[in-house]
Amino acid sequence: MIYAYDKVYLRIAQRSLGEMLSYAVYDLGYELEDYYKRFLQSEYSMRFSKGDLFVITGMSGAELAIRVLDIPDDDIIMPSYNTAKSQEYWTGWILAYYQWENGKTFEMIDKEIPICKIRNMYNPYHEMDISSAILKLREMSQVSSCLLYTSDAA
């Protein structure tokens, strides 16, 4: 498989997406689903999916959230950078890996597995090896694809 960007950038991408979701929820007060819709509608979602290194490595997760929401400079809230990793951080972290691995856009992934279902995987998957969570996401994607296919055929 050809990946959108080299694996050397993957950890940075995971951290960035995790920080973005955590900042949007805990510092800006957005509901995860509401913010994630804004991300999907922004140009940054597609640019991230395609491996745009400026989006992936050129800014922090908080900066990415600020750009997605187009927050004026005077209204920017400094990120709290909590050392404890939240469910939202883990959601972004695992989502970035899953997106990198399968090459789907975030929009395609969201149609198969809504962001709230990924967040709900936090317990017990954040304690497990990443491969367990990725395997579960693949299974969820296949079930969703089968359901979409059978509903279209009916």
Where would I find each of the regions flagged by the language model?
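C-terminal alpha-helical interaction appendages
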Residues: 1-28, 34-88, 92-98
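A charged, amphipathic interaction segment
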Residues: 83-143
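Conserved small/polar residues in nucleotide/adenosyl-binding loops
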Residues: 149-154
